[in-house]
From Swiss-Prot:
Active site annotation, chain numbering: K175, H294
EC number: 4.1.1.39
Cofactor entry: Mg(2+)
Name of the protein in its database record: Ribulose bisphosphate carboxylase large chain
Oligomer status and interactors: Heterohexadecamer of 8 large chains and 8 small chains; disulfide-linked. The disulfide link is formed within the large subunit homodimers.
Originating organism: Spirogyra maxima
Alphabetized SUPFAM superfamilies for the sequence: RuBisCo, C-terminal domain, RuBisCO, large subunit, small (N-terminal) domain
Name of the coding gene: rbcL
Length: 475
């Protein structure tokens, strides 16, 4: 026997395959304040015990592999391994379990959402022993969150920048999302902004297409912003989408927006990637730009109840990576979103400290230790009749974004925006007077119609429009 073989044998190395649970299932483990904690919803294959499945998740997302390797003896597995420390069955679901996994902080690069996700939601999601796997929540300890810059500015600084307080902000996505020339696009922006809007927005897939190159769009939109500001005396903005095919091109677009003096730009953070998003967020803080985030591709990742990543995790990741706004669903519009679940991740975006609350899908207490908050953006199939519910659900620190609910007004863009602004002001005033918007909302809107023909026309157009479908992703 060679000396090397003798050394390995003496160290206790034995080739072969061991059950994961012998090493990675540790129900006696007491979690540390510095651990990153994860809650996985797992569906094991028939015949796979939940303890083995949970241990496999912990192993494959940290230090483990499918067989014993002699190089395990060159490190300290007890220090670096992930641990499945608890498993509970999912009520009302057959063969589904919540596996709780603790990860030592040293497994992750500081300030990198990319590295965090590569480990925790990497190869393990294709593991054959699992029929399905979903990451429901993460607990990010202060020791890790403090390594991130977070949002470029946060909503408190944003309010100071645009000098608007005491109400939700109003936005509008320009429609049709594709096909307008740059000049006509700028015209639509101007009509909306002069009518009472705070922001207008590029849609997520508006980048630099043959019918409208990005530089032309930026120029005509900047002209529209300055003209609307001069007429209204209010600070206005448009989310100029800087998303591009390369990071270098993305930064070029951000720099041009800064040169034009506009207040805010935009990024598609999931399709663009976390590395690109974090780089852009750093640029925005250094150069005084607000950053609006669109979540295009989110439903591909989070809509199925038993597999993928829940949006509350993607929301936490965005807060660390950086963004001042992010689309969060509406509860009442055309997009998926159950009320309590939505309010749970809205609080995770905005608040400093959020208590564990399983009724809202929050599996862990989260302390952001003064990281700036992100404004949730309610967007997708909303119109003036939704305004009372949106005001009550999201409160002042939010952006209410009407696309078709502005541009679909029978009298045009500016009257559409007037209708939304009047409806919002009426709801905020009624709330401040102590009225119950959940019960009296429709009456508040009807009263406001007496003073605004634009609102009355909008109410008539959309009085029958509802999106009443069962929510797929429930607790």
């Amino acid at each position: 026997m060679s000396p090397q073989t003798e050394t390995k044998a003496g160290a206790g190395f034995k080739a072969g395959v061991k059950d994961y649970r012998l090493t990675y299932y540790t129900p006696e483990y007491e979690t540390k304040e510095t651990d990153i904690l994860a809650a996985f919803r797992m569906t094991p294959q028939p015949g796979v015990p939940p303890e083995e499945a949970g241990a496999a998740v912990a192993a494959e997302s940290s230090t483990g592999t499918w067989t014993t390797v002699w190089t395990d003896g060159l490190t300290s597995l007890d220090r670096y391994k992930g641990r499945c420390y608890d498993i509970e069955p999912v009520a009302g679901e057959e063969n589904q379990y919540i596996a709780y996994v603790a990860y030592p902080l040293d497994l992750f690069e500081e300030g990198s959402v990319t590295n965090l996700f590569t480990s925790i939601v990497g190869n393990v999601f294709g593991f054959k022993a699992l029929r399905a796997l979903r990451l429901e929540d993460l607990r990010i300890p202060p020791a890790y969150s403090k390594t991130f810059q977070g949002p470029p500015h946060g909503y408190q600084v944003e309010r100071d920048k645009i000098n608007k307080y005491g109400r939700p902000l109003l936005g509008c996505t320009i429609k049709p999302k594709l096909g307008l020339s740059a000049k006509n696009y700028g015209r639509a922006v101007y009509e909306c902004l002069r009518g009472g809007l705070d922001f207008t927005k590029d849609d997520e897939n508006v980048n630099s297409q043959p019918f409208m190159r990005w530089r032309d769009r930026f120029l005509f939109v900047a002209e529209a912003i300055y003209k609307a500001q001069a007429e209204t005396g209010e600070i206005k903005g448009h989310y100029l989408n800087a998303t591009a095919g390369t990071c270098e091109e993305m930064m070029k677009r951000a720099e041009y927006a800064k040169e034009l003096g506009v207040p805010i730009i935009m990024h598609d953070y999931l399709t663009g990637g976390f590395t690109a998003n974090t780089s852009l967020a750093h640029y925005c803080r250094d150069n005084g730009l607000l950053l609006h985030i669109h979540r295009a591709m989110q439903a591909v990742i989070d809509r199925q109840k038993n597999h993928g990543i829940h949006f509350r995790v993607l929301a936490k990741a965005l807060r660390m990576s950086g963004g001042d706004h992010i689309h969060s669903g509406t509860v009442v519009g055309k997009l998926e979103g159950e009320r309590q679940v939505t309010l749970g991740f809205v609080d995770l975006l905005r608040d400093d400290y959020i208590e564990k609350d399983r009724s809202r899908g929050i599996y862990f207490t989260q302390d952001w230790v003064s990281m700036p908050g992100v404004l949730p953006v309610a967007s997708g199939g909303i119109h003036v009749w939704h305004m009372p519910a949106l005001t009550e659900i999201f409160g002042d620190d939010s952006v209410l974004q009407f696309g078709g609910g502005t541009l679909g007004h029978p009298w045009g863009n500016a009257p559409g925006r007037v209708a939304n602004r009047v409806a919002l002001e009426a709801c905020v005033q009624a709330r401040n007077e102590g009225r119950d918007l959940a019960r009296e909302g429709n009456e508040v809107i009807r009263e406001a119609c007496k003073w605004s023909p634009e609102l009355a026309a909008a109410c008539e157009v959309w009085k029958e429009i509802k999106f009443e479908f069962d929510t797929i992703d429930t607790l």
